Curated annotation (Swiss-Prot):
GO terms for molecular function: structural molecule activity. It holds the Pfam family Flagellin_N. It is found in: Secreted; Bacterial flagellum. It comes from Escherichia coli (strain K12). Changing residue 168 to C: In HAP3; exhibits impaired swimming only when in contact with a solid surface or a semisolid matrix. This is Flagellar hook-associated protein 3.
Length: 317
């Protein structure tokens, strides 16, 4: 009889322990909002959640990379917008300077104006970002890409690239020689077949030198100066077309970054929903199970209490 009593006691204790464990499990799920708190709760879901968490982290990294890329590309576009305006202003000065009726003093004044535009363009070519890094220097960001005197490019040879999505990498920092020392393949050719000037600063230096040279007393000097101005005018047109080509590329990249951001946001929402489906609680089901398990636990307590109240005489009946 004592063996039977012990058996009943152990069974009741197991019932209480099991009910209490289940009740506490549902309580923990309700307090955390998670159905899968420990891997043992659902090994398959827990494993899938780990993989999904890694995908979420990668998506977040690409989002951050696109933010950085957008800032870099936007800054470059803003600077090149100013470069475009400066080149157009220089073109206007060169066209006006080609007027054969100007005096040497007028020409010298125009030379001063064009020198100011050259200085402005050189300053733009050596633009730095908020961290003091030169944006047109490639990976040599700590050194000014263009020399002050001749405007020669001394920056890095490789453009800065950024991985902005799993399968997309783009240039976010052009080297200065691709902008200020380059022309497009369909550039206006020189009438005599000679090589076209590619360096924007050399073009302007040629015009400045021609305008500073007095020509009032020499037809030959006038012709030489006019030829230099004509060549500069052709060069500026080629340089402007090159800058506009780069700006078109930047505009396309900004649009693409915006599209990738939209896709990334959609991907993040989908991943969040997937993660919720895997590990979050079903509140209706969990609350119902919590209440049912609480009721079962109370019943187990009552059964155990009732059993303890029984005498050996009552048990023997």
């Amino acid at each position: 009889m004592r063996f039977s009593t012990q058996m009943m006691y152990q069974q009741n204790m197991r019932g209480i322990t099991n009910s209490q464990a289940e009740w506490m499990k549902y309580g923990e799920q309700m307090s955390t909002g998670k159905r899968v708190v420990n891997p043992s709760d659902d090994p398959i879901a827990a494993s899938q959640a780990v993989v999904l968490s890694q995908a979420q982290a990668q998506n977040s990294q690409y989002t951050l990379a696109r933010t950085f890329a957008t800032q870099k590309v936007s800054l470059e576009e803003s600077v090149l917008s100013q470069v475009t305006t400066a080149i157009q202003n220089a073109q206007e000065k060169i066209v006006y300077a080609s007027n054969g009726t100007l005096s040497d003093d007028d020409r010298a004044s125009l030379a001063t104006d064009i020198q100011g535009l050259r200085d402005q363009l050189l300053n733009l070519a050596n633009t730095t970002d908020g961290n003091g890094r030169y944006i047109f220097a490639g990976y040599k960001t700590e050194t000014a890409p263009f020399s002050e005197e001749k405007g020669k490019y001394v920056g890095g040879a490789e453009s800065i690239k950024q991985q902005v999505d799993a399968s997309r990498s783009m240039v976010i920092g052009h080297t200065g020689d691709k902008i200020f020392d380059s022309i497009t393949s369909n550039a206006v050719a020189e009438p005599d077949g000679s090589a076209s000037e590619t360096n924007l600063f050399a073009m302007l230096d040629s015009a400045i030198a021609a305008l500073k040279t007095p020509v009032a007393d020499s037809e030959a000097d006038k012709e030489t100066a006019a030829a230099a101005l004509d060549k500069t005018n052709r060069g500026l047109k080629n340089s402007l077309n090159n800058v506009l080509t780069v700006r078109a590329e930047l505009g396309t990249q900004l649009n693409e970054l915006e599209s990738l951001d939209s896709l990334g946001s959609d991907r993040a929402l989908g991943q969040t929903q997937q993660m919720s489906d895997l590990v979050d609680v079903d509140w209706n089901a969990t609350i119902s199970s919590y209440i049912m398990q609480q009721t079962a636990l109370q019943a187990s307590y009552k059964a155990f209490t009732d059993m303890q109240g029984l005498s050996l005489f009552q048990l023997s009946k």
